[in-house]
Amino acid sequence: MVFRTLDDVDVLGKRVLVRVDFNVPMALGKVCDETRLVRHKETLVELQKRGAKLILLSHCGRPKGKIEPEFSLRPVVSVLEKIINQPVAFAPDCIGSTVQVAVEALQNGDVLLLENVRFYAGEEKNDCSFAGALAHNGDLYVNDAFSVSHRAHASVEGITRLLPSYAGRSLQGELQALEKGLGNPTRPVVALVGGAKVSSKLFVLNHLVEKVDTLVIGGGMANSFLAAQGIHVGKSLCEHTLMETVKKIIKKAQECHCTLLLPVDVVVGFRFEKDAPHRLYDIGDIPEEGMILDIGTRSIVHINSVIDKAATLVWNGPLGVFEMPPFDKGTIAVARHAAERSLTGRLVSIAGGGDTVFALNHADVANDFTYLSTAGGAFLEWMEGKVLPGILALMQP
């Protein structure tokens, strides 16, 4: 994948519209988590040092095309100033005369944050006139937000038809890391897919069996794969209406010479709650009243042995109900094993998705993986093999 970056453009004195993702959690008008802001530091500091006039575009929350004060980006200003060690001006709108006046006042190296682009319905509709109003205040455009690049929105895709467009450093780093995962990986490649439902990851599973050497299935979706092979799963979460679909995925994996790895033993609980009574069972012995809530000890050993032989690991989704101890043990054990191999340079590990990030933080290994994507929907669509609208616009002709 070849795309245009900041190395390909002179930004001195240029009005640079930068699409960032400042969709951060807030409480009582204060930012609660700075993680997403920090991810943009490299791009913003570089542009500032190179003498660009920075105009930042972002959404926050889901205001549905109207002004909702609780979704204002104003609280971001003071936090961002500390992160980039630079004053940040704020415009109470993202288009119109107020913004134009603020942009005209910018000097080289200045930073201006515009108000939430989703206060206008034209943003999510990818309206060309709204995209034009955004583009009016810039000479060129930089996308630094992989997490929104699956959205064909005005500030992500529409604007790229109107201005020369480039990838920022955060986006560039993410794309290069993901390329190591599935684009041009070192083999053998293992994908570990967990989570509750097969239905939410059908496209992911169908794509992965074509791309990886081993596909490990965990979490609630493993129950559907077990059931499709005639294994009784008791009261476990299971999508019985998808049995034929699951069988087709199993068949496709065989045709693509992709090894499918399912649990061989499981932790069964008898109530769906923290510290519920539980026992370890082989998959052929699951009691009628039981629910599969985690993978068992032999399954952990099997998965870790597959990871030992892998050069690349792509992970999305927990292996059990990790938010309810003690049913987090499987996820923690495998995560720590993968992290240890990553730290010693024996494994390239790429992980992403909201629950996955939470699970790896819970296991205290999030910083030990080769790359951890905080993008949710964008990461899943990448795993499906889709070319994201916001990325397509940056690719070299």
UniProtKB/Swiss-Prot annotation:
Extract one GO BP annotation from the record: glycolytic process
Record GO terms (molecular function): ADP binding; ATP binding; phosphoglycerate kinase activity
Task: Tell me yes or no: is Kinase among this UniProt entry's keywords.
Answer: yes
- What pathway does the annotation place this protein in? Carbohydrate degradation; glycolysis; pyruvate from D-glyceraldehyde 3-phosphate: step 2/5
- Which EC number(s) are documented for this chain? 2.7.2.3
InterPro entries assigned to the protein according to its UniProt record, in alphabetical order: Phosphoglycerate_kinase, Phosphoglycerate_kinase_CS, Phosphoglycerate_kinase_N, Phosphoglycerate_kinase_sf
Kindly state one GO CC term assigned in the UniProt record. cytosol
What keywords appear on the UniProt entry?
ATP-binding, Cytoplasm, Glycolysis, Kinase, Nucleotide-binding, Transferase
Main location as per UniProt: cytoplasm
Pfam families (alphabetical): PGK
Assembly and oligomerization:
Monomer.
What is the recorded name of this protein? Phosphoglycerate kinase
Give the organism the record lists: Bartonella tribocorum (strain CIP 105476 / IBS 506)
